[in-house]
């Protein structure tokens, strides 16, 4: 399993950006081009090497994520508990116990724990118990300092579902979503390393990955859409206005 590491003990803007680029480059098929653009496209679903491991090296320990390479869904994470035992927590309908062993060999079968809620944002948000504002991940914010704090909430601690869900919401957005959307990657580097308030545009991007990918794949020529598109933050006519980092795999270009 390919492992990509982000050092958060002494991070820099450049390190974070190249970390996101490495995720993107690991899953892209350089031969695929959609809509006459140069935007990276995920390769066809792999038959082997289905997963990617990401190590988030915090100042007080490492927590790891398992991602599906065909869509960058976060399917599991690995953390030490309060007895210094490696535990792997996973979404059962996204990865099997045997596959989990290949991603996180440190955790024995008895130390694999099924996450009892769904892997979609709404399920994770409910378990994160966000009380302010929209009660969604938007209220948590983003940023390197926040990622480090959220890692500390799950590293070398007894499992607390609220802290786990908050860690997942922040980590998913700063890894997979940042790889999909340069807009998010750029917000993190612009505010580096500080925590910053998320905005509606971040959320609109995150829920529109499929829609945007399909529009570029099927209704875009030389980077220009055949009509105006509105993905929730105003009309766009050119694909480059979307600052995309990575498109969903939709087959060979038509």
Swiss-Prot record:
One of its GO terms (molecular function) is toxin activity. SUPFAM superfamilies: Ribosome inactivating proteins (RIP). Expressed in seeds; most abundant in the perisperm. InterPro entries: Ribosome-inact_prot_sf (IPR036041), Ribosome_inactivat_1/2 (IPR017989), Ribosome_inactivat_prot (IPR001574), Ribosome_inactivat_prot_CS (IPR017988), Ribosome_inactivat_prot_sub1 (IPR016138), Ribosome_inactivat_prot_sub2 (IPR016139). It catalyses: Endohydrolysis of the N-glycosidic bond at one specific adenosine on the 28S rRNA. Keywords: Hydrolase, Plant defense, Protein synthesis inhibitor, Toxin. It comes from the Eukaryota. GO terms for biological process: defense response; negative regulation of translation. The keyword Membrane does not apply. Its EC number is 3.2.2.22. The keyword Hydrolase applies. Thermostable at 68.9 degrees Celsius. Belongs to the ribosome-inactivating protein family. Type 1 RIP subfamily. Exhibits N-glycosylase activity. Catalyzes the release of one adenine from a ribosome. Acts as a ribosome-inactivating protein and inhibits protein synthesis. Induces cell death in Huh-7 liver cells. May contribute to the protection against plant pests and predators or play a role in regulating the death of plant cells. This is rRNA N-glycosylase sapovaccarin-S2. It comes from Gypsophila vaccaria.
